[in-house]
């Protein structure tokens, strides 16, 4: 087959470093009967070693040229190809059994894709993703740091996350202009409390971080007032990045009990 030309509109940077590939597969630790879904298999850097360990693998791919290449290289009884956009894909449709999801995620859609994947937290055992290093730093950030934000709160509410591997630009072809890393995400329901209305929690967090430099008192106007915050022992003069995930959950539940809905 002719050499595939990476397509910028799909955010294609193909992994080619053998030690990084081995590190990712080791982290995923696939067992023969696992139901594994790979997002964006590309030229098969992770696909091939996964297939060597699995009875069957599912992949989600949007690029028609890559789909044809995958069909030519792998038998259908080993590889199921789901053609389409991962942002719109129903991962739960693959199997009723627990899922493992892995992928070198396109950096140009990483944040919306992470929010989409987070909705499957109750269907997965773990997820491992290659992402822009700065995105992973936001995912695992601590309160009162510049990286702590909406993405942090909503993902840490659902998952335990760990930055497990640094990946330099030269590990890819073509090399991206940024450093990359690999994150492990393990569902951890209830680790930061349980929201009675997750849509309300999402609304609260989104509004709180709408203007990072403003205080909670200002950002939450129309949703929560100073009295709501003070009732929970939260200083209305704090900025949103100062508030731990647990306090966002407590505030969402307080507002829910007063009749607010997402």
UniProtKB/Swiss-Prot annotation:
Enzyme Commission (EC) number: 2.1.1.182
Annotated PROSITE patterns: RRNA_A_DIMETH, SAM_RNA_A_N6_MT
Binding site for S-adenosyl-L-methionine: 13, 15, 40, 61, 85, 104
CDD domains given in the database record: AdoMet_MTases
UniProt GO molecular function: 16S rRNA (adenine(1518)-N(6)/adenine(1519)-N(6))-dimethyltransferase activity; RNA binding
Uppermost EC category: transferase
Reaction catalyzed: adenosine(1518)/adenosine(1519) in 16S rRNA + 4 S-adenosyl-L-methionine = N(6)-dimethyladenosine(1518)/N(6)-dimethyladenosine(1519) in 16S rRNA + 4 S-adenosyl-L-homocysteine + 4 H(+)
Gene3D superfamilies found in the cross-reference section: Ribosomal RNA adenine dimethylase-like, domain 2, Vaccinia Virus protein VP39
Transmembrane segments: none
Location of this chain's protein in the cell: Cytoplasm
One Pfam family recorded for the sequence: RrnaAD
Signal peptide limits: none
Keywords, sorted A to Z: Cytoplasm, Methyltransferase, RNA-binding, rRNA processing, S-adenosyl-L-methionine, Transferase
Reported function: Specifically dimethylates two adjacent adenosines (A1518 and A1519) in the loop of a conserved hairpin near the 3'-end of 16S rRNA in the 30S particle. May play a critical role in biogenesis of 30S subunits.
Protein name per the record: Ribosomal RNA small subunit methyltransferase A
Biological source species: Chromobacterium violaceum (strain ATCC 12472 / DSM 30191 / JCM 1249 / CCUG 213 / NBRC 12614 / NCIMB 9131 / NCTC 9757 / MK)
Gene from which the chain derives: rsmA
